[in-house]
């Protein structure tokens, strides 16, 4: 599963249903005023206010920090941060299989085919204490994952075989478990008890992306009494953007190769995986790669860059290469610099257009 892509398409769907998506924005404070929440937000060093009837604190690793710092309140529960890290190496085997490797410490490690050319290996479970804004894989974690692979595969890995890595922290509900791997992965929803006409606060402790819809429905169930006209649950049958009229990646790839002159199969496959049927929105009226604008390399064209900036809130080259396309594994420094220069010009033109 491409977790970053899942988050983006959910944001797209929410936007299409009327939500306002505000990226690169920080909440400075939230206070109760006349039965509603008044939030002060910061975007590009500019402050502004919005009001809300309910506040959902789904800030993950910062759930208790938000309560303490932005709300000036005491959290009702605590969290434990557990670091999980992955490494990416050249594909270990040609078959489309995933492996679950049982280690002698009773943990399991997954090996999953990743982006056709690579294998994704993970994850670790390490207690984390530090700044959740800055999380990196450690040498010990890298060695641990390599050792697990070498215990199970004839092909032996070395640290220099690691092409890339990434690490994150899981914000888990603190159930007083002594081992990081034993901490509950279940979510806990903590609803404030408003007095008089105060607006409610719902804080989400724990949870994971694989059960995000279940968590969201449980959260809305708790909020239903504050919104008597709330509709019934509907997401079980709802398709995410890009799944409309979509049959399979293979069928869509064939359609793209037939419709777009000069398109490489690898790019068609990436588009089909990333955008689904929304790929036609991205392409517009273009029927030839020669009309897709500047080529940044590795199948990334100006047409796609403009689309993810305009429709998917991408701002930086990191947004595009790492969070939208995964092409960071192929781009070198000069290619990334060319994309950065184009984005600077694009943002300048958009600002001038807004000013006009």
Go through each PLM region and give its residues.
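Helical element adjacent to the flavin cofactor pocket in flavoenzyme catalytic cores
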Residues: 1-54
């Amino acid at each position: 599963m491409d977790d970053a892509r899942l988050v983006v398409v959910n944001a797209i769907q929410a936007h299409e249903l009327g939500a306002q998506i505000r990226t690169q924005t920080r909440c400075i404070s939230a206070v109760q005023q006349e039965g509603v929440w008044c939030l002060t937000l910061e975007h590009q060093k500019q402050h502004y206010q919005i009001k809300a009837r309910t506040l959902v604190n789904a800030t993950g690793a910062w759930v208790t920090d938000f309560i303490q710092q932005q709300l000036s309140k005491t959290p009702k529960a605590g969290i434990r941060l557990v670091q999980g890290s992955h490494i990416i190496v050249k594909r270990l085997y040609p078959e489309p299989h995933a492996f679950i490797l049982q280690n002698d410490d009773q943990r399991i490690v997954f090996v999953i085919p990743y982006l056709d050319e690579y294998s994704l290996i993970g994850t670790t479970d390490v207690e984390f204490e530090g700044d959740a804004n800055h999380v990196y894989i450690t040498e010990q974690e890298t060695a641990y994952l390599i050792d697990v692979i070498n215990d199970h595969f004839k092909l032996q890995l070395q640290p220099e075989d690691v092409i890339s890595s990434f690490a994150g922290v899981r914000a888990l509900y603190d159930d007083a478990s002594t081992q990081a791997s034993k901490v509950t992965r279940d979510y806990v929803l903590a609803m404030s008890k408003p007095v008089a006409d105060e607006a409610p606060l719902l804080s989400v402790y724990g949870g994971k992306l694989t059960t995000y819809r279940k968590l969201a429905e449980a959260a809305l169930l708790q909020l239903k009494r504050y919104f008597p006209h709330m509709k019934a649950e509907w997401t079980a049958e709802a398709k995410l953007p890009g799944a409309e009229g979509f049959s399979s990646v293979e069928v869509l790839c064939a359609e793209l190769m037939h419709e777009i002159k000069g398109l490489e199969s690898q790019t068609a496959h990436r588009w089909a995986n990333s955008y689904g049927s929304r790929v036609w929105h991205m392409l517009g009226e273009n029927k030839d790669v020669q009309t897709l604008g500047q080529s940044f390399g590795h199948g990334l064209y100006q047409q796609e860059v403009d689309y993810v900036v305009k429709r998917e809130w991408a701002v930086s080259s990191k947004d595009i290469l790492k969070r939208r396309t995964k092409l960071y594994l192929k781009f070198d420094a000069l290619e990334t610099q060319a994309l950065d220069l184009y984005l600077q010009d694009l943002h300048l033109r958009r600002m001038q257009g807004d000013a006009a």
